[in-house]
From Swiss-Prot:
Spans traversing the lipid bilayer: 224-244, 252-272
Family per similarity comment: Belongs to the UPF0496 family.
Organism expressing this protein natively: Oryza sativa subsp. indica (Rice)
Keywords assigned by UniProt, alphabetized: Membrane, Transmembrane, Transmembrane helix
One cellular component term from this protein's GO annotations in UniProt: membrane
InterPro entries the record matches: DUF677
Protein known as: Putative UPF0496 protein 2
Membrane topology (UniProt): Multi-pass membrane protein
Region (Disordered) location: 385-408
Subcellular compartments: Membrane
One matching Pfam family: DUF677
Amino acid sequence: MIERSNSTPSATPVRPPLAVDEEYNQAFRSKSFLDLWSHAHHHLTHTFSSFKLSTSTPCAGRGGAREDDFLHAGGDGGAADDSEQSCSYTVLDDFVLEPSPESLARGARLQQRRRRRPRRHRVETLLIEYFDVTEEACEACSALLAAIGAARRHHLTLRRLLLRLDGGDDDDAKDALARHVRLDNPLSPGSLSEFHDVHARCSPLASRLAAAQRRLRRLARALRIARGTAAAALVGACAAAIVAAVVLAAHALVGIGVAAAAFGATPAGAARWWARRAAEKVSSRHYARAGATLDAAARGAYIVGRDLDTVSRMVRRAHDELEHGRDVARIAMRGHGERPLLQEVAREEEECEEDLRAQLAELEEHVCLCLITINRTRRLVAHEMARGLPPPSPATVTTTSEERLTSS
């Protein structure tokens, strides 16, 4: 008889908690994103320093001491350091758009020289519009980064003036606060009109590119069907000519010569002429290359449009949060200096600052990713265009070298 063991079964090992933040950072902050982020911080660190020197005016009484503690000490556990790092990231001056507009214009000139009759097709018009829209999207993202820095400075000045108002400097602080609140919100739709215009153009452009790509696909299919039908008709014509020649050969030898001459002159000559003209005008390979380029452009426009959708929603949230802080400041400005009211305003502004700082930091990251996406999609479209181009002739290479030397 087997005795039952009295030892309790070993407990199931507890799984470690899922590190969502760590997984998110590994997937979100890629190498290209970190390179772009550190590059911007390295070149624009002086922005917050100059702003801090221009706004660090001495204040009398308890409000001045609290303001200095807020700006320099950072009583909430390193908030000042985070603000300094974030405020330095305002404009991305050194961002390089790929491919550059100059290289695109040079490629367009080379393509026109290869043609006998320079004429802009619908495909080229759509591709030019795609590159124009993505270039404007890059400029709009740079302007949005500047607006994010302006929003940080706006809210920081708002906190400073509220601290002065709480410190007893009623008249001057109230006047300065009234002037500051009357300023426009840096994230308002009027201040970011360029961004919203580009955002509105992405979705229709993606639809037009997709429609043009479907049209080219239908044309390529129709061309394949037409070529198959023409080949079948050609084979039938040749077979009929051979049968006619055999029938005529049974009656006279002269008929054989006539049939051979007719066969050599009419069906084969017509077939060679038709094939040569078709090869000159259009080919299924040409349609396939143009369709692949349009497909890459349509995908790129759709992806950029979706990224701008996300950024637009985040801009709206940050705008509402900043506007909430401005409304709270208006309430404090309309009050008569009651201590409980000012304490409640200070508490509300502190909560608003934490939420606004997190939202602006996340918005900056998404704008950086949007810039990287714009470059990646432009490179893919340019790569598809380069695959369809024939190798340049020596005369074209010589002309291009002369243009580069002249421009330099």
